[in-house]
């Protein structure tokens, strides 16, 4: 049996529907309960049904909230608990859960990928390497191969865009800002970027690095190609990818080579892209890839919809992920979601058990710090490297585990992504800071191995403590496989409070049920 919302996200005042798949069983009844945090907000009973049914659970006039859905199904003498979650927002851009698609042959048209991403509450989907060429995104050919030789059906791409829209998911076209093919470069050699030896920058002898400066014809050509992706294919926005290198280069547009700094050019490229695409789509989605956290300091405040960071060495420890999130929040003024694209090579190089442990720990760390993790995509797959098409497929069991983590994230959306929550982990605990004290276990506020990683965030009415168990983990490198953490019990925390406490609750995606339990 299965339970999931019909859409990845719902808008304020929209009817919320859940799909209950009874897997052909004859069911006497199902009791549906909807919770906001720990408060029961809706309940109904559905009697006598077989197979799939849609259950309407009402409309929610709220601007930003996550809800938990629990359904108890009675079939004969058996009672089965099913759980899912959904969120309601006044603007989808307030909560962006990023996933990916990369398979676009005719055979992939109905491969179940969109349906799976919907069950995982992925509401923004990057279409990786969907285009004909990086310098010529849209082709009229029905069947073509991309620059890496991958076969693509144009109709499959368009069908997936349509299907995503039906599920409340926004399709984002991958469009590298830097790359052109060799034939294009040879026609426009002065549009490229050059090193100090005045040789063109080229990546794997395929991609020529182009000049995105304000006065470069490449910038205008690129934005025109983005426009075609939206008008001809139906994409909702653009993923502006970069390579991360070079950071300085020479332009050959003038009479003599001129050194330019790309961190000074990229923000205006983002803003100009936003302004020009607004003419074809009133509110296009725009994501820029800060590869290795560069240049977040100059791009975070630009007119984009998230601060997106692709995480690479030397950002290699758990503490670095929290650092990236905190800095991105500061540079952006906390005005937009933060997404970490942190790919896990243990799914290629280590045992599946250790890889799954690494995935659960890393995602928990990112979510606990108020950001989103780009890892999942296609049909039950995860990313292990920067070339998305070489993803790793999960088993049904492992896919269900990561899906449950997503359910938990959405159910407690208010506690993870409230913009008013401040991270006080490093200032309110340890040494002579008595606001928070752990009296029973070794804890770390920056993700040390063999300790409980405790992140503390608070606002005027809530104090949130997020525990990630690193006990039994031999190191704190996020991109290495991990042994199964050793369960910890009887944790005692002392918290200083300034007013009467209304309630203390604990919840976890690892138990039998996700409903928060009161702590006496």
Which residues does each PLM region occupy?
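Active-site-adjacent "subsite" loops/lids of carbohydrate-active enzymes
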Residues: 91-92, 103-107, 173-233
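Beta-strand-enriched, solvent-exposed domains that form extended recognition/catalytic surfaces
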Residues: 1-91
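Active-site neighborhood of glycoside hydrolase catalytic domains
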Residues: 214-307, 311-326, 332-333
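Aromatic- and acidic-residue-enriched carbohydrate-binding clefts of CAZyme catalytic domains
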Residues: 131-157, 184-215, 244-264
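Aromatic/acidic polysaccharide-binding cleft in carbohydrate-active enzymes
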Residues: 242, 335-427
